[in-house]
Amino acid sequence: MSSWILLAHAETSGFGLNLDLFETNLINLAIIIGLLVYAGRGFLGNLLSNRRAAIEAEIREVEEKLASSAQALSQAQTQLKEAEAEAARLLVEAKARAAAVRQEILDKAAADVERLKATAAQDVSTEQQRVLDELRRYAVAQALSRVETQLSQQLDEAAQQRLIDRSLATL
């Protein structure tokens, strides 16, 4: 019943602070908290120590990865610079080779043009010589044809015999 009275009294008085140590269980709470601190210190210490060791190991691992990554980056940058230098050198060589090949092609084309001109001139000269030879043969054939015609008209049988005899005598 006394708890009913206290409850009724607490309701009527409003909010208040109970300073009775035995009723508020402060001693029990202090003992429990003390035991938790004493007993939990080792457990909590181990837990925090393990967590700290794990974090330190992760930090060391990350620092090692950072160092190896920085080294790999440095090597990659060096290789990039070397590759760029090699590409520039190859470009210069390619341009020089292209210029040399271009000049070689131009020289060969000029030589081919000169050779074609010489061949064409020789072909023209040969054709001219052939035409002249043909014209000479034609002229000789025409002249012989006229001579035969004239000889047959002007020479009779006796004149032909005298001509043959004279030709034989000169031989």
Curated annotation (Swiss-Prot):
TM segment ranges: 26-48
NCBIfam families in UniProt: PRK07352.1
Annotated SUPFAM superfamilies: F1F0 ATP synthase subunit B, membrane domain
Descriptive protein name: ATP synthase subunit b
Keywords: ATP synthesis, CF(0), Hydrogen ion transport, Ion transport, Membrane, Thylakoid, Transmembrane, Transmembrane helix, Transport
InterPro entries with a match to the protein in the record: ATP_synth_B-like_membr_sf (IPR028987), ATP_synth_b/b'su_bac/chlpt (IPR002146)
Functional description taken from the UniProt entry: F(1)F(0) ATP synthase produces ATP from ADP in the presence of a proton or sodium gradient. F-type ATPases consist of two structural domains, F(1) containing the extramembraneous catalytic core and F(0) containing the membrane proton channel, linked together by a central stalk and a peripheral stalk. During catalysis, ATP synthesis in the catalytic domain of F(1) is coupled via a rotary mechanism of the central stalk subunits to proton translocation.
Keyword Transport: yes
One Pfam family from the record: ATP-synt_B
Organism for this UniProt entry: Synechococcus elongatus (strain ATCC 33912 / PCC 7942 / FACHB-805)
Disulfide bonds: none
Domain of life from the UniProt record: Bacteria
Family that this chain belongs to: Belongs to the ATPase B chain family.
Record text on subunit structure and interactions: F-type ATPases have 2 components, F(1) - the catalytic core - and F(0) - the membrane proton channel. F(1) has five subunits: alpha(3), beta(3), gamma(1), delta(1), epsilon(1). F(0) has four main subunits: a(1), b(1), b'(1) and c(10-14). The alpha and beta chains form an alternating ring which encloses part of the gamma chain. F(1) is attached to F(0) by a central stalk formed by the gamma and epsilon chains, while a peripheral stalk is formed by the delta, b and b' chains.
Subcellular location(s) of the protein: Cellular thylakoid membrane
Recorded GO MF terms: proton-transporting ATP synthase activity, rotational mechanism
Principal location: membrane
Keyword Transcription regulation among record annotations: no
GO cellular component: plasma membrane-derived thylakoid membrane; proton-transporting ATP synthase complex
